[in-house]
Regions:
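C-terminal regions of mature proteins
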Residues: 1-71, 187-212, 216-250, 266-268, ...
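Active-site-adjacent "gating/activation" loops or surface patches in catalytic cores
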Residues: 55-82, 97, 283-285
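Short beta-strand/turn micro-motifs at beta-sheet edges
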Residues: 67-71, 120-124, 218-221, 276-281, ...
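Glycine-centered hinge/linker elements that transmit conformational signals in sensory
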Residues: 246-260
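Short Gly/Thr-rich strand-loop-strand
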Residues: 266-279
Length: 493
C-alpha cells in the first residue's frame, strides 16, 4: 500500500513530559496473600490411638482439648474451635439484638480476610453458643496465624453509622423472614425455640433495634471478649505443643478476665406439662406440629428411643396421612430435645384442612403406630436397629465432619466426648416392646411434656373452630412465657 505517512522526531521536551507523568503513576506488584500455604508437612505419629480429644491443660487455665485426626492423618489440615463463654452474651433481648448486629458488622469488617483465607484453603466463621465462637479449618501452616488475625479483626473493627443502619435493616429483615416462613416452619418454631435459653420474643427484639447506638455495639463487643472464659478444641494436623502455644498466644491476645470452669444452663421437663400455642400463619396453608417428651428416661435413653422411633414411624406416618388420606405435602415424624430430654414429634402442612381436623387424624394414627410397634417381628426390628448403629459408626466423610462429631459435647462441656458411644449402647438395648412403651408413655399417656403448635391458614381469616380444642392443655401466647415456666439446670458441681 502507498498510504502517505509522516515521521516526526520525539523532542527532548516530550521525553521529559512523559517521564514526569510516568513517575506519577503508582505501579506495584499485588500484595502477597499471607495465607497461601507452602509447607504441607504432617505431624509425626505418637503411636497412640485417640477415641476423642484429650485435655492439654489443667486447673483454672484455659481449657484446651486436642486430638490428631484418626481418619485423615495424611491431610495437612486441622479444625479449630475457639469458644469465648460468657453468661452475659445473650442473657436478655437487648443483648441478643446487640450480638446479631455485632456479628453482621464483623462480617463486613472481615470480608477481605475471609477472601484471603478462602484462596489459601482456609474457611472460618463466627457464631454464638453461650458466647462468641470462632471456627477455622483448612491447611495448617497458616491456620494459627489466621485464627489470631480473625480474633484481632473481630476485637478491633470500627464500623460507622451507615454500616450500623445497614446492620439494623438486615436484622429486621431476618425477624420478618422468620415470621413469613412456610406454615410447617412456623409450626415447629416453638419446639425449636424452647431450648434456646433464654428465648425472647421477636417483637421485643424488634422494638429494641432502633434504640441501639454505635457506641453501645462497640462496648458490647469489648465486653463479649474481655469478660469471657475461653475454651478451645483442635482436631487434626497440629501438634499438642503447637496447640498449647496457640492457646497461650490467644490468652495473651484476648485479655479475657473469665476464669474457672464454664457450665451452661438448660431447660428441664421435670413434671407433666401440656402446652398449646396457636396463631394465624402468613399463607393460606395450615400446619400442625406436636412434640412428646416422656418423663423417666435419661438423656441417652430418650435419645436412642426417639431416634429409633423417628426412623421406623416416619414412613408409616407419611403413607397414612400423605399417600392415603392426602392431607398435605409436608409430612414428617422427627426427634427433638427439650434441653437434654429427647422426644418424638409429628408435623404436617395442609392446603385443605385446618389444625383441628389434622389433630384428629394424628390422634387416630397414634394407637395404630403403637400396635404396629408391638407386633413388629424381631428380625425386622433388628434391621432398623443395625442400620441406625451402622449410620452412627460410619466413617466421617471429611476432617470437618470428624471434628463436628465432638462439637456438641464440647459445647455442652461433656469432655468425655462419649455421646455417640452412649447413644449406640442404648440403641443396642432397645426391643420392640421397650420402644412401644416409650411411644405409649410419651404420645398416648402423655406422661411428660405434650406440646402442640397450631398454624391457621390466612385465606379467609382463621376462626376459633379451626384450632383443635385441647382440654387439660394450657394455651400460651408466648414461647418465652412457656419457657419461664420450666425448670433450669446446670451441670456445675
Amino acid at each position: 500500500m502507498n498510504a502517505p505517512y509522516q515521521v516526526d522526531k520525539i523532542t527532548a521536551a516530550q521525553f521529559s513530559d512523559w517521564q514526569q507523568q510516568a513517575q506519577q503513576i503508582p505501579l506495584s506488584l499485588p500484595t502477597l496473600n499471607p495465607y497461601i500455604p507452602s509447607d504441607f508437612s504432617l505431624i509425626p505419629s505418637d503411636g497412640k490411638h485417640y477415641d476423642h480429644p484429650v485435655a492439654l491443660t489443667n486447673g483454672d487455665s484455659m481449657r484446651i482439648y486436642w486430638m490428631p485426626s484418626q481418619f485423615y492423618a495424611s491431610e495437612p489440615k486441622a479444625a479449630i474451635t475457639l469458644a469465648l463463654r460468657n453468661k452475659s452474651a445473650i442473657s436478655d433481648a437487648r443483648q441478643q439484638v446487640l450480638f446479631g448486629l455485632n456479628d453482621y458488622l464483623s462480617s463486613l469488617a472481615l470480608d477481605e480476610l475471609n477472601s484471603q483465607a478462602s484462596v489459601g484453603g482456609i474457611s472460618f466463621s463466627t457464631g454464638e453458643d453461650d458466647g462468641l465462637v470462632f471456627n477455622a479449618s483448612g491447611f495448617t501452616q497458616r491456620l494459627p496465624e489466621l485464627l489470631k488475625k480473625l480474633v484481632e479483626g473481630y476485637a478491633s473493627f470500627q464500623p460507622d453509622a451507615q454500616q450500623l443502619e445497614q446492620a439494623k435493616s438486615w436484622y429486621l429483615d431476618r425477624l420478618e423472614a422468620a415470621e413469613k416462613g412456610k406454615a410447617f416452619e412456623q409450626a415447629i418454631q416453638p419446639m425449636q425455640m424452647l431450648s434456646q435459653l433464654p428465648y425472647t420474643q421477636r417483637e421485643a427484639r424488634r422494638q429494641l433495634v432502633k434504640q441501639i447506638t454505635l457506641q453501645e455495639v462497640m462496648d458490647y463487643r469489648d465486653a463479649l471478649i474481655q469478660h469471657a472464659t475461653p475454651e478451645m478444641m483442635v482436631v487434626g494436623n497440629l501438634s499438642a505443643d503447637r496447640v498449647r502455644q496457640l492457646g497461650e498466644e490467644l490468652k495473651q491476645q484476648l485479655h479475657s478476665t473469665g476464669h474457672g470452669y464454664w457450665h451452661s444452663n438448660y431447660v428441664v421437663v421435670d413434671k407433666p406439662i401440656k402446652a398449646n400455642l396457636q396463631k394465624t400463619g402468613s399463607s393460606t396453608d395450615s400446619a400442625l406440629a406436636t412434640l412428646y417428651v416422656p418423663l423417666g428416661y435419661s438423656e441417652y435413653q430418650s435419645m436412642a428411643n426417639s431416634t429409633m422411633l423417628s426412623q421406623i414411624v416416619q414412613p408409616w406416618f407419611y403413607n397414612q396421612l400423605r399417600t392415603e388420606e392426602q392431607l398435605g405435602y409436608a409430612v414428617f415424624a422427627y426427634q427433638m430435645p427439650i434441653g437434654r430430654q429427647w422426644g418424638i414429634g409429628f408435623l404436617l402442612q395442609s392446603n385443605s384442612k385446618a389444625p383441628a381436623y389434622l389433630l384428629q387424624r394424628f390422634q387416630a394414627f397414634y394407637p395404630q403406630a403403637e400396635q404396629r410397634l408391638r407386633s413388629m417381628k424381631a428380625e425386622d426390628f433388628a434391621q432398623y436397629q443395625q442400620a441406625l448403629i451402622n449410620d452412627l459408626k460410619q466413617r466421617p466423610q471429611t476432617l470437618d465432619e470428624e471434628a463436628n462429631r465432638y462439637s456438641r459435647d464440647f459445647n455442652r462441656q461433656n469432655f468425655a466426648f462419649d455421646t455417640r458411644e452412649k447413644a449406640i449402647a442404648q440403641i443396642q438395648q432397645l426391643t420392640p416392646a421397650s420402644l412401644a412403651d416409650f411411644f405409649h408413655q410419651a404420645v398416648l399417656a402423655q406422661q411428660g411434656m405434650a406440646m402442640i403448635s397450631q398454624i391457621g391458614g390466612s385465606h379467609d381469616g382463621t376462626h376459633d373452630a379451626d384450632y383443635a380444642p385441647l382440654p387439660g392443655f394450657t394455651t400460651w401466647d408466648e414461647v418465652a412465657r412457656l419457657q419461664q415456666s420450666l425448670s433450669v439446670k446446670s451441670d456445675a458441681p
